[in-house]
Amino acid sequence: MYPVDLHMHTVASTHAYSTLSDYIAQAKQKGIKLFAITDHGPDMEDAPHHWHFINMRIWPRVVDGVGILRGIEANIKNVDGEIDCSGKMFDSLDLIIAGFHEPVFAPHDKATNTKAMIATIASGNVHIISHPGNPRYPIDFKAVSEAAVKHQVALEINNSSFLHSRKGSEDNCRAVAAAVRDAGGWVALGSDSHTAFTMGEFEECLKILDAVDFPPERILNVSPRRLLNFLESRGMAPIAEFADL
């Protein structure tokens, strides 16, 4: 098990069922040292209000030895790469994930999807692209991976894509991993937990990475320090409370 999980949802996204406290308890039990809460951006129908994200600044940084990153899974809104995270939201958040979700951006042809994803990557506003292997949104894996390397953005391998959602993702996720490997980029693993019980579960992701001989040194979840170095390279100020994670 890796000690970092970068994608999960709380009861603030009303189709999820666990609280921040639930995730902290599970993290302690499972040996997770650092995790990010990434509830859906406000353009989703059941997502939190934007004030929810702004007020995440009141969260403690560390509880019982577990570090907590303040994040969002924003929605890609259009081909210009706009997302539903802006203004004061950025000031309160550590981690910006963004991806396609049908209620906000309907599936298009491969060229349009690729244009939208690359524009999002190039915007400088996101750290990770969520579930880029979704078969509902065909993309040019090579072009997206090369753009991600250029702009220091990681592509996610999402464990839930093989279990509960986005059926048929396996071949695409293998292609994503291979393209990132060839481009020399980063992958981020996300459990995409909607209950705390599945946080830190990456078994299906690891099968994909093993299948393409993906280099472990390019996986962000290997250690808290690796992930924090990545975020700091993107401009995040060092967080003193995380120094001993």
Swiss-Prot record:
Keywords: Hydrolase, Metal-binding, Zinc. GO terms for cellular component: cytosol. Zn(2+) 2 binds at residues 15, 40, 194. Its cofactor is Zn(2+). Transmembrane segments: none annotated. GO terms for biological process: bacterial-type flagellum-dependent swarming motility. CDD domains: PHP_HisPPase_Ycdx_like (cd07437). Binds 3 Zn(2+) ions per subunit. Belongs to the PHP family. Homotrimer. This is Probable phosphatase YcdX. The gene is ycdX.
